[in-house]
Amino acid sequence: TASAFRDASADGAGGGGLGAALGEWIVSTDQPHAEISMLARARQLAIPATVHVAIGTDIVHMHPGVAGAAMGEATAIDFRLLAAVVCDLARGCWLNIGSAVVLPEVFLKVVNIARNLGQPLDGVTAINFDMMPHYRTSRNVLQRPVERGISLIGHHEINLPLFRVALLQRLQSSKKAGRDDS
C-alpha cells in the first residue's frame, strides 16, 4: 500500500492529482478487484475522483518512501479539481458517506470558493450517510452550505444499496416519462 501511495503521490503531483493517479495505478498494475474500485472506474471513465489527505492520519504517511511534498501537491491538485466540480453543482447532489471530519471541512471550503467566485449553488441537496449523527456533518454539510440537507443514519451496508436502488428507480421512471432528472 505504501509503494502505491508513493508512486501515485509522485505521479499525481505532476498535474493529474492523487485520485486520478491512484486510479491509474490500480488499473495499470492490474490489481486484484480493480473492477470494483471506484478510483479505477472513475479513471477509466474520465470522471473526476479526488483524494483529500490529512497528513499523519494514515499509516502510509509514515513510510519513508512516501514524500510529503508530493503527497501534499497531489492532494492540493485534487482540492482545486473538487472546487471546480462544485462550481457546477447547482441543482445537484453532494453525498458525504461516513466522513465525520475531513470531508465536511473540505466540502464547506469548496462551497465557499464557488460562492466567492460568484457561482450559483441554488438547489443543491446534501445527503450525509453515517452510523450516528455528528455536529460537523450536520452543520458543515447539511445546514450551512446547502438549501436542503438529508441525514441518513444507519448501517452503510443497508442504506447504500437501498439508496442505489431508489436512485436507479427514479432515473428509470424519469426516462420513461421523458424527463431529464439526472
Regions found by a protein language model. Give the residues of each.
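Active-site phosphate/oxyanion-binding loops
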Residues: 60-78, 135-145
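Short, conserved, surface-exposed binding loops centered on an aromatic residue
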Residues: 39-43, 83-88
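Active-site rim beta-loop-alpha module in soluble metabolic enzymes
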Residues: 46-64, 68
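General beta-strand structural signal in soluble alpha/beta enzymes
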Residues: 50-53, 95-96, 127-128
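Ligand-binding beta-strand-loop-alpha-helix segment within the catalytic cores
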Residues: 1-45, 51
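A general structural motif
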Residues: 31, 53-54, 69-87
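Glycine- and other small-residue-rich loops at beta-strand/loop junctions that grip anionic moieties
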Residues: 27-28, 71-75, 95, 99, ...
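C-terminal functional extensions of proteins
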Residues: 84-85, 91, 100-182
